[in-house]
C-alpha cells in the first residue's frame, strides 16, 4: 500500500508523490519509479507496492500534479504538455527525499516505463547522486 507525501522538487516548489516502504525496519535501496503517460494511477501505485515488497524504498513522483486518465488521447495531451525540465526537477526532488530518509541505504536508482523510461534517461543525464539507472521502454 502506498501513502501520499508532499516534498520539494530540486528548485523548491511543492510536489506530491506516492511512497511504499519495505517490511521491517532495515535500511533499503531507494527506487524512483517514474509514471507512464497515464499518470500516477492504480497501476503505478501497485508497482510501487510490489517493488517495496521486494525490499526497496520506492517513491513515484506525480509529474501530472494529480491528473490521471484512461483515455489515450488525453494521456497523449498530458504527456505533450509535460515540461521535461520541470519533470527532471521533480525526479531530483524524489531522489533527495529518498536520500534523506532514514529508511534509505543511500543507494538510489531510477526506472520507468513508456514515458517514464524516457524521463529516466533524462534523469540519468541531469540528476546527480543516482546509483543506478534502468529504463523499460
Q: Where does each model-flagged region fall?
A:
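Catalytic beta-strand/loop cores that center a nucleophilic Ser/Cys/Thr
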Residues: 2, 14-17, 110-111, 125, ...
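Serine-hydrolase catalytic machinery in alpha/beta-hydrolase-like enzymes
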Residues: 4-103
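Alpha/beta-hydrolase fold nucleophile elbow
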Residues: 102-114
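Short glycine-enriched nucleophile-adjacent loop
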Residues: 117-128, 133
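Conserved small/polar residues in nucleotide/adenosyl-binding loops
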Residues: 136-137
Amino acid at each position: 500500500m502506498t501513502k501520499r507525501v508532499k516534498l520539494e522538487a530540486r528548485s523548491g516548489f511543492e510536489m506530491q508523490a506516492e511512497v511504499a516502504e519495505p517490511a521491517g525496519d532495515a535500511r533499503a535501496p531507494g527506487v524512483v519509479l517514474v509514471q507512464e503517460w497515464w499518470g500516477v494511477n492504480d497501476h503505478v501505485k501497485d508497482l510501487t507496492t510490489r517493488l517495496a515488497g521486494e525490499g526497496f524504498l520506492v517513491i513515484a513522483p506525480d509529474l501530472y500534479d494529480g491528473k490521471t486518465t484512461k483515455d489515450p488521447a488525453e494521456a497523449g495531451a498530458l504527456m505533450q504538455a509535460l515540461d521535461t525540465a520541470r519533470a527532471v526537477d521533480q525526479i531530483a526532488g524524489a531522489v533527495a527525499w529518498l536520500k534523506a530518509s532514514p529508511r534509505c541505504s543511500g543507494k538510489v536508482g531510477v526506472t520507468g516505463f513508456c514515458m517514464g523510461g524516457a524521463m529516466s534517461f533524462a534523469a540519468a543525464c541531469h540528476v546527480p547522486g543516482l546509483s543506478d539507472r534502468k529504463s523499460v521502454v
